[in-house]
């Protein structure tokens, strides 16, 4: 990532979960340091999960399972605390982040894919359900 023409490392932050929105999005209080906090919506970087708010009952079932998986990981991690590596903001203004919880070496993003709750996604046309 470049800032003022110079390559810099990605930024890492400590967070406190507010709520899980769906399988690939949560709201959190982000600690910016110097006793400064901001509440932001975090879109999980590099993954997409099936929709939990849809009329397609099979897709909804998979979407709700992904949401429950994320909720369990984040709520049971150090009283809702987790860390993120920020990848900037997405097209809808959400923070794009890789989430990390205590007790897991892999990111929540990777765990979602590994456990069949998500697929790789970097802004391209979304997959149809079942695809």
Which residue stretches match the model-derived regions?
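Small beta-barrel nucleic-acid-binding modules, primarily SNase/OB-fold domains
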Residues: 1-131
């Amino acid at each position: 990532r470049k800032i003022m023409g110079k390559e810099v490392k990605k930024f890492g932050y400590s967070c406190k979960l507010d709520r899980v929105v769906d399988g690939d999005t949560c709201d959190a209080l982000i600690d910016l340091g110097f006793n400064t906090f901001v509440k932001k919506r975090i879109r999980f970087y590099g993954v997409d999960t099936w929709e939990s708010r849809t009329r397609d009952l099979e897709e909804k079932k998979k979407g709700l399972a992904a949401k429950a998986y994320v909720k369990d990981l984040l709520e049971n991690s150090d009283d809702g605390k987790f860390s993120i590596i920020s990848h900037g903001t997405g097209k809808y203004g959400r923070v794009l982040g890789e989430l990390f919880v205590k007790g897991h070496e892999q990111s929540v993003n990777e765990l979602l894919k590994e456990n069949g709750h998500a697929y790789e996604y970097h802004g391209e046309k979304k997959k149809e359900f079942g695809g």
